[in-house]
């Protein structure tokens, strides 16, 4: 999806796990590269699931990136020859990234970011609500529900860990529709109650 803008723009690609966010981000980056628009590609350092310094889609497509854990590390490699920036797993950055992204777009830079909008409990994930609020364009992707094969709109955590930032893949997470997500949470509560009763 190539669109030429004379002014900056913030594009957000979001949705649950397994919905193809990284695939869509890679596709947009490749189109920019084809159009000779120099793009800084950034990956959050926290995400080490598939590769340390690459964005990797589930279809196996890869792109080399710089790795950063905060805005200052991005600023060290940014220069005025870049006309676009793409950031994967943006939800893991702190609030400083919000103003930085807004500033870049205000200077005419095309900003493309991807990340989870909600966590395993269907609650807003980190800084994503603020980023969605300042976005010019939002694409919300859907996965396939692990349980019923309908559209999967939420990320379900198989384990009982409550930490919002818990790195994992198929061993820890599933995509689920609203109904199956709620049923899964209820089943986990029932299992916890059963374990508690057995321990008494």
From Swiss-Prot:
Pfam families: TK. It is found in: Cytoplasm. Gene3D superfamilies: 3.30.60.20, P-loop containing nucleotide triphosphate hydrolases. InterPro entries: P-loop_NTPase (IPR027417), Thymidine_kinase (IPR001267), Thymidine_kinase_CS (IPR020633). Its EC number is 2.7.1.21. Coiled coil: none annotated. Zn(2+) binds at residues 145, 148, 177, 180. GO terms for cellular component: cytoplasm. GO terms for molecular function: ATP binding; thymidine kinase activity; zinc ion binding. The active site is at residue 89. PROSITE patterns: TK_CELLULAR_TYPE. It is an enzyme of class 2 (transferase). One of its GO terms (biological process) is DNA biosynthetic process. ATP binds at residues 15-22, 88-91. It catalyses: thymidine + ATP = dTMP + ADP + H(+). Keywords: ATP-binding, Cytoplasm, DNA synthesis, Kinase, Metal-binding, Nucleotide-binding, Transferase, Zinc. Homotetramer. Belongs to the thymidine kinase family. HAMAP family: Thymidine_kinase. This is Thymidine kinase. It comes from Mycoplasma mobile (strain ATCC 43663 / 163K / NCTC 11711) (Mesomycoplasma mobile).
């Amino acid at each position: 999806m190539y669109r030429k803008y004379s002014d900056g723009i913030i594009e957000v690609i979001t949705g649950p796990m397994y919905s193809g966010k990284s695939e869509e981000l890679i596709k947009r980056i490749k189109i920019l590269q084809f159009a000779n628009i120099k793009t800084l590609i950034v990956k959050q350092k926290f995400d080490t699931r598939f590769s340390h310094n690459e964005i990797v889609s589930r279809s196996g497509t890869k792109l080399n990136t710089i790795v950063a854990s905060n805005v200052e590390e991005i600023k060290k490699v940014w220069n005025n020859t870049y006309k676009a920036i793409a950031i994967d797993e943006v939800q893991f950055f702190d609030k400083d990234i919000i103003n930085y992204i807004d500033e870049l777009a205000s200077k005419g830079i095309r900003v493309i970011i991807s990340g989870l909008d909600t966590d395993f409990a269907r609650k807003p994930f980190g800084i994503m609500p603020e980023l969605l609020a300042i976005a010019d364009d939002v694409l919300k992707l859907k996965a396939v529900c692990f349980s019923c094969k309908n559209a999967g709109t939420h990320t379900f955590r198989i384990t009982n860990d409550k930490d919002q930032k818990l790195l994992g893949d198929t061993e820890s997470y599933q995509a689920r529709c609203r109904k199956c997500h709620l049923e899964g949470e209820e089943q986990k509560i029932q299992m916890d109650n059963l374990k508690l009763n057995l321990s008494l």
